[in-house]
């Protein structure tokens, strides 16, 4: 099954209500061709897979058991933190992640301390966190960081040169004569990591007296991240459709980037500024900032009613 949590009314998700049978919960971050998901299905667990590639999601949808596996098209670190309660995941798997070898990209690696804290917070006590990689240095760094964090201990470390599961990258690296390094970590200590998203979702919107103000396209840096705003589209019904890309950069080198469309349309009290009806996005703090920004500009500050707060920081760079 394909899950679109952007439209849900509360976080984290109730996974027991999503799956038809109540089983232990396993999560894979970056499932590629879906072969490892199929392996997990045979273990009697409910499986959740995260992937940022639409093509990978489409391929996996054709092979998974839709009663046992749920797929999400989104960043797995963000999803693990926002969609799961603390101590709710029984096992976490990361297969052949990008190693990000350059020092300037170190924060993007998946075994930094802030990310390890997220893993430890969502995993049940004594659960396993498993990594497979073809990069020895990456495996060693994962072990070192995990043990130094005090959150995980090393349960197993194995090296092989044959295909076991048949994932795309496993087959590729083995065919090139590379070794595969398998690291199994066990949760040692719990740590609490709060969600970024509000537990109860509100639909951000504003009512303005008029919409004749000037909308300034460009890049805005707010308290919560970055907003890239483009010129609006308009029609003869006095409606505006305003495209933007919104990034919430709240933590650990991973930002949630969303393509957002804001509509401005006539309302009995003037005009209403809100997410377009077809906008399938998380209502993050920076999406709320976007609503305030547009409402403030098109009304020349004459906002009649709004259910979000202005960002405490707002810097503008023209397009």
From Swiss-Prot:
Gene3D superfamilies linked to this entry: Vaccinia Virus protein VP39 (3.40.50.150)
Residues annotated to bind substrate: 134, 167-170
Keywords (A to Z) from UniProt: Methyltransferase, S-adenosyl-L-methionine, Transferase, tRNA processing
GO function terms (MF aspect): tRNA (guanine(46)-N7)-methyltransferase activity
Source domain of life: Bacteria
GO cellular component annotations of the record: tRNA methyltransferase complex
Keyword S-adenosyl-L-methionine: yes
Coiled coil regions in record: none
EC number from the UniProt entry: 2.1.1.33
Catalytic activity: guanosine(46) in tRNA + S-adenosyl-L-methionine = N(7)-methylguanosine(46) in tRNA + S-adenosyl-L-homocysteine
PROSITE patterns with a match to the protein in the record: SAM_MT_TRMB
Membrane-spanning intervals of the chain: none
Presence of the UniProt keyword Methyltransferase in the record: yes
Residues reported in the UniProt entry to bind S-adenosyl-L-methionine: 28, 51, 75
Pathway assignment: tRNA modification; N(7)-methylguanine-tRNA biosynthesis
Family: Belongs to the class I-like SAM-binding methyltransferase superfamily. TrmB family.
PANTHER family: 3-DEOXY-D-MANNO-OCTULOSONIC-ACID TRANSFERASE/TRNA GUANINE-N 7 - -METHYLTRANSFERASE (PTHR23417), PENTACOTRIPEPTIDE-REPEAT REGION OF PRORP DOMAIN-CONTAINING PROTEIN (PTHR23417:SF14)
Entry protein name: tRNA (guanine-N(7)-)-methyltransferase
Species: Coprothermobacter proteolyticus (strain ATCC 35245 / DSM 5265 / OCM 4 / BT)
Lineage: Bacteria, Pseudomonadati, Coprothermobacterota, Coprothermobacteria, Coprothermobacterales
């Amino acid at each position: 099954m394909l899950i679109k949590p952007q439209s849900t009314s509360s976080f984290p998700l109730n996974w027991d209500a999503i799956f038809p049978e109540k089983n232990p919960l396993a999560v894979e971050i970056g499932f590629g061709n879906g072969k490892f998901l199929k392996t997990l299905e045979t273990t009697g667990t409910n499986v959740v897979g995260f992937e940022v590639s639409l093509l990978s999601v489409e391929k996996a949808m054709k092979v998974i058991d839709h009663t046992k596996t749920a797929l999400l098209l989104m960043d797995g670190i963000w999803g693990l933190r926002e969609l799961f309660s603390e101590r709710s995941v029984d096992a976490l798997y990361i297969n052949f992640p990008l190693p990000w070898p350059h020092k300037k990209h170190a924060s993007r690696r998946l075994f930094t301390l802030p990310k390890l804290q997220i893993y430890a917070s969502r995993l049940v006590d004594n659960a396993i966190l498993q990594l497979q990689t073809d990069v020895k240095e990456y495996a060693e760094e994962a072990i070192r960081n995990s043990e130094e964090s005090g959150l995980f201990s090393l349960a197993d470390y194995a090296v092989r040169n044959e295909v076991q599961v048949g994932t795309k990258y496993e087959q590729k690296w083995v065919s090139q004569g590379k070794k595969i390094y398998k690291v199994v970590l066990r949760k040692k200590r719990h740590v609490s990591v709060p969600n970024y998203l509000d537990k109860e979702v509100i639909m951000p919107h504003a009512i303005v007296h008029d919409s004749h103000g000037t909308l300034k396209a460009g890049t805005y840096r707010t308290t919560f991240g970055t907003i890239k705003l483009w010129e609006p589209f308009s029609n003869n019904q006095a409606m505006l459709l305003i495209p933007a890309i919104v990034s919430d950069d709240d933590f650990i080198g991973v930002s949630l980037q969303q393509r957002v469309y804001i509509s401005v349309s006539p309302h009995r009290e003037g005009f209403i500024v809100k997410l377009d009806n077809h906008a399938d996005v998380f209502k993050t703090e920076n999406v709320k900032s976007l609503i305030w920004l547009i409402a403030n500009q098109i009304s020349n500050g004459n906002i009649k009613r709004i259910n979000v707060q202005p960002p405490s920081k707002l810097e503008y760079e023209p397009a």
